């Protein structure tokens, strides 16, 4: 059966809103995530007179490349997000950077309704778990340090920029890239071409273009000397928390919420990104990657500091307490049953 056209898929997502809104009758609070669920939360607020809490993980107006993926469905996602955020009783931004973006994109939203609650992670699940067996299974040389990327093939995640930087990285250094689920055929073809070019011009690229189990990802995070996040737009950066929890140093773009996670010079390095200066960005990215791959002691020190930061600032208990406090504030101080 052929895949539905993007516009049809967007309408199907809208139809799910009706079922979600009907299912929450009798709830004290409705809390939604993503543009289509947020519209469902808005409908539930109208029908059942319950407070609607809306978490913003990213903003549609700041992702114009989504039009390439969604077609006319992008206009629908813009409408749903605006309607939801302007009508919500409380809006949670996953970073201070996102909070600023919300108020810039939607000036009619009362700033007092927008709070920051970071995303969280379970550091007991994501912890150092090295595995030479996993490295060998993927064709990675355990005797050589490597830089690691894990993410979707999208404009947002900056994979073409990382592949351009790979041409500038010391050719004796290994680069391991796990990437799948391209947004469009166009970006899939672009990335395939860049991978071929990197392989022609240098060795040491391990390209894994398929989904791999979480256990294997944790092993790769744990064995990597550095995790690379070259995103051009990143409201938070959960994958960075996953890497840091596994004691991996980070080299990342200085965009969005990333500077709220990575402490410059302590848990990794931040690289300035400007759309009009991508060559400077890829050169700086390659330089920081080489620096950490050439200095294992520094990479280990940053990795250990990163895990400590995750445990103290991004564990789920702290995130849950902040969220429950927001619910109780909306309910006039009434306690939420645990």
Region spans (language model):
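Nucleotide-sugar donor phosphate/pyrophosphate-binding loop at the beta->alpha transition
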Residues: 50-53, 61-83, 100
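Carbohydrate-associated surface elements
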Residues: 97, 120
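Nucleotide-activated donor-binding/catalytic signature segment of Leloir-type glycosyltransferases, i.e.
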Residues: 188-211, 215
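Short alpha-helical donor nucleotide-sugar binding micro-motif in glycosyltransferases
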Residues: 219-224
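Aromatic "clamp/platform" in nucleotide-sugar-dependent glycosyltransferases that forms part
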Residues: 232
